[in-house]
């Protein structure tokens, strides 16, 4: 049994609140249970170890219940308490894929991801905090191992959301709601909807409050709390996304009051103590429809061998103070969300689009990183300070690209842009030389008409105008992380962990099956060599997509674990405080004298990682809903459009294609390919026509048309496009499955 060590007795601090006392007691209990000489103790024994008076037993029991519900402690036989991992119980957050499989990200960052089969997920939903009993035969949970861990959900610690959007339907004897989210595995049984502001009709989109769900083998029960309207009613599609992802349409009145109280202009009192950069040639470069300008730059030639670069970032922390209504709401939202038809901002427009936005021809407050950079792109020095600027010009990326594609004019700002391009390209080459991975893919932007229908789909390419700003922001993020780490300040870092070795091995086998040389991908240099090799191959884009799927997802953490994709040991987010709460935290950590505690930052880092993923899912779904309607209209017309596509995966039932023109993927079922009967070759991972010996393999380029849209499952099936001048469907590439040499010649 653990001995009393003569520590400070845990007494109630004079004048402290109950919450503060509870937090102190929680910390003491967790510290005690983590000691190497601790043996499982019951409540009376814990009272002695913590040096608590006997009359505080009820208080201790209440704290233990809270800790147990949070997954921070576990109760075992004899009502004794231990750390959960000692009982093979792991608390963490579960993420579900659309096939129903779960993946637990343990709270303990030293533990590997845990895979949870669909049958073992219990009643967990996507992004719930859960307690998982690990499979004791699996070694993947031990620190430093690479084998995958497996487990089973034994308890829901915290529901991420209890409100679910779906379609109201009727069975023989009861009403039910089919969830829009395919990761919810069952329909939800509901009683006859009560009066919630508008009548509910079968087929309507509704919001359900989840009430009971006892077992994964039974249907959950709920209650309709809001009727959104018919699915084809204008605006209902986006309202469904807003409700499904709990995105607020409006700010609370106290938040708006604080935002409006900041005023509309920078005053002399705001400028006091700042470096005056208003005479500098400061500019912003953003998308043509942007309104929240987070960042600005200025470049100046110091000598033949040196440049001075100023990276100015909007000083949101000057206006949004810790503990205010503005700060509380910003933290709750975590980030701005960019849906296909609107922005759900993190901050009210009085700040995001006005006083904090680095608009041209007005004074604005910034946090500045000033670099001294060698001619070859190496950073020689960086310093940090609050500043005031007066932006000279606002550019769109398209305008900058047009300037960079022509010869420099006498205009000093245009000359600066040409110089910035040359310098940032050198910086970019150094970054890739250091191991940064080239994982850029063209993106798309959907433009809507006044009725919310797709007008056109535009491709966004990461050209030199984007790269110019990207390299400046990466430099600033790295420099700030370096400064924070050198000062040992509690902060939040942007981390992208090294991929799981098992996934890399599986991916390497896929590459080798395509007869492409591939070394040990646990070495970043080999990954770079492979990606460079793939850029020159027709199959390359498909395999690059496969590599992306093998990577970990970037997140926020209080530990500076580095960024694998960027090959940076020190990295954070500093450059977008208008739209990311993480950056606002980092501004405070860098410049404020009173820093937040590590425990508070850890909780915030997990929260904003969740809100970031939530926003990404909402943004994707908002685009998909518009695309589904767009493709359904094509089917109804009888003349669906033709789209270039790339085969990204081959299965025995068909092949998946990526359609860049739609920014989406889908299945081409074999049942729709009518020119032959195709057999799946497991060894070569391709499909071979039994009669013609034609081959369908990874990386093939085809032309497809939409064949089926399933809005419930959020899936689109394609078919090979019908040739304009032929009666039959397009044939797959005519390649013989047994002749590798002839295939390589055609490439």
Please give the residue ranges for each predicted region:
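Non-cytosolic beta-sheet module surface loops
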Residues: 94-96, 168, 646-649, 708-710
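A short macromolecule-binding patch
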Residues: 111-116, 184-191, 663-681
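Internal insertion modules embedded within essential enzymes
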Residues: 143, 166, 217, 708-720
């Amino acid at each position: 049994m653990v001995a009393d060590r003569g520590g400070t007795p845990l007494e109630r601090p004079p004048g402290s609140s109950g919450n503060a006392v509870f937090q102190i007691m929680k910390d003491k209990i967790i510290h005690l249970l983590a000691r190497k000489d601790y043996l499982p103790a019951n409540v009376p024994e814990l009272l002695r170890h913590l040096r608590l008076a006997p009359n505080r037993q009820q208080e201790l029991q209440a704290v233990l219940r809270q800790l147990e519900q949070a997954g921070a402690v576990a109760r075992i036989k004899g009502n004794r308490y231990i750390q959960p991992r000692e009982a093979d119980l792991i608390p963490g957050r579960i993420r579900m894929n659309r096939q129903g499989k779960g993946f637990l990200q343990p709270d303990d960052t030293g533990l590997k991801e845990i895979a949870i089969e669909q049958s073992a997920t219990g009643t967990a939903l996507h992004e719930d905090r859960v307690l998982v009993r690990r499979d004791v035969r699996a070694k993947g949970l031990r620190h430093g191992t690479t084998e995958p861990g497996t487990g089973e959900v034994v308890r829901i610690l915290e529901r991420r959301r209890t409100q679910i959007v779906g379609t109201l339907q009727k069975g023989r004897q009861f009403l039910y709601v089919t969830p829009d989210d395919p990761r919810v595995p069952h329909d939800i049984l509901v009683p006859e909807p009560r009066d919630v502001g508008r009548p509910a009709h079968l087929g309507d989109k509704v919001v359900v409050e989840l009430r009971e769900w006892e077992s994964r083998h039974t249907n959950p029960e709920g209650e309709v709390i809001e009727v959104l309207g018919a699915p084809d009613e204008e605006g209902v599609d986006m309202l469904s996304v807003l409700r499904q992802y709990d995105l607020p349409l409006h700010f609370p009145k106290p938040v708006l009051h604080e935002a409006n109280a900041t005023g509309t202009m920078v005053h002399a009192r705001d400028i006091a103590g700042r470096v005056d950069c208003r005479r500098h040639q400061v500019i912003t470069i953003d998308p043509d429809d942007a309104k929240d300008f987070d960042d600005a730059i200025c470049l100046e030639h110091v000598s033949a061998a040196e440049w001075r670069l100023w990276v100015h970032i909007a000083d949101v922390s000057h206006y949004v103070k810790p503990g205010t209504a503005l700060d509380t709401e910003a933290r709750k939202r975590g980030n701005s969300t960019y849906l296909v038809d609107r922005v759900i901002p993190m901050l009210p427009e009085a700040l995001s689009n006005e006083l904090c936005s680095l608009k041209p021809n007005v004074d604005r407050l910034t946090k500045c990183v000033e670099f001294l950079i060698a001619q070859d792109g190496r950073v020689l020095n960086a310093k940090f300070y609050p500043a005031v600027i007066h932006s000279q010009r606002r550019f769109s990326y398209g305008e900058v690209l047009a300037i960079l594609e022509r010869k420099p004019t006498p205009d000093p700002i245009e000359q600066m842009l040409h110089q910035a391009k040359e310098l940032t390209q050198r910086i970019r080459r150094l970054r890739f030389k250091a191991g940064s991975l080239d994982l850029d893919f063209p993106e798309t932007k959907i433009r809507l008409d006044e009725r919310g229908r797709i007008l056109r789909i535009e491709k966004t390419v990461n050209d030199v105008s984007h790269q110019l700003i990207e390299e400046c922001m990466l430099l600033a993020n790295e420099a700030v992380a370096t400064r924070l780490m050198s000062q040992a300040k509690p902060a939040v870092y942007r981390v992208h962990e090294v991929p799981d070795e098992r996934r890399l091995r599986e991916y390497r086998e896929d590459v080798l099956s395509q007869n492409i040389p591939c070394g040990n991908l646990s070495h970043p240099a080999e990954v770079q060599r492979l990606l460079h090799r793939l850029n020159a191959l027709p199959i390359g884009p498909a395999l690059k997509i496969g590599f992306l799927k093998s990577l970990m997802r970037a997140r926020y953490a209080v530990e500076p674990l580095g960024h694998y994709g960027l090959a940076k040991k020190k990295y954070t987010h500093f450059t977008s405080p208008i739209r990311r709460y993480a950056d606002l935290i980092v501004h405070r950590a860098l410049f404020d004298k009173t820093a937040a505690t590590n425990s508070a930052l850890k909780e915030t880092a997990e929260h904003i990682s969740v809100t970031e993923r939530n926003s990404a899912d909402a943004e994707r779904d908002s685009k998909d809903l518009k695309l589904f309607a767009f493709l359904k209209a094509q089917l109804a017309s009888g003349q669906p459009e033709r789209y270039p596509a790339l085969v990204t995966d081959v299965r025995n039932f068909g092949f998946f294609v990526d359609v860049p023109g739609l920014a989406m993927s889908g299945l081409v079922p074999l049942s729709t390919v009518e020119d032959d009967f195709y057999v799946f070759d497991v060894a070569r991972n391709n499909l071979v026509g039994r009669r013609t010996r034609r081959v369908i393999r990874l990386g093939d380029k085809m032309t497809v048309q939409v064949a089926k849209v399933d809005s419930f499952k959020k899936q689109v099936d394609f078919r090979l496009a019908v040739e304009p001048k032929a009666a039959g469907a397009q044939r797959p590439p005519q390649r013989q499955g047994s002749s590798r040499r002839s295939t390589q010649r055609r490439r």
